[in-house]
Amino acid sequence: MTVAVGSRLGPYEIISAIGAGGMGEVYKARDPRLDRIVAVKVLPASLSENPAFRQRFEREARAISKLSHPHICTVHDVGNEAGVEYLVMEFLEGETLADRIAKGPLPLDQVLRYGIEISDALEKAHRQGVVHRDLKPANAILTKSGIKLVDFGLAKMDVPALSSVVSSLSVVPTQADMGLTAQGTILGTFHYMAPEQLEGGEADGRTDIFALGLLLYEMATG
């Protein structure tokens, strides 16, 4: 669902569009209560009508809200306005790791620094039962304070109730967005999937480690 610039979602004033991904559109917004700039992620209307997608959106909010780490994007709020589901996150300024890699290989000291920061963030998430499932350069933002992992849109709380939701979904790929999770799609982004994801198996912390290895390789080689 496209949200008009200047409109509101709950208390949040929409300033501009940032981009779009598998789980919806992202906007730059302002929280007038705290005079704070935030990022608001909106679930598409076509998906918000689907109970499975709404449940996944809420799962994303729960997963991220439990993670407090300097290299994981902070979630501030989640809400529903006139049937529109939205997630309010920390607004990050900086280029994506994908944009940086496109310019060529990173210096070795930066590769090591970012690798350590991502590893530390993943360890925190995994210890709390959260698997990112879609780790890739586009989901890492280079800020002044270091790298930040974003878009836990494919995150899975490692508990039976939520695992059953994921395992009940089909894993046959479509030509549409490979980041979507629904009947007829794979969880993840094709080029960064671990073998178990491609085979339709369950993902765990090792799945993220596989993707991290690819990130390190791309950072070092460009």
Task: Label each region the model flagged.
Residues M1-G222:
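Conserved ATP-binding/catalytic core of the eukaryotic-like protein kinase fold
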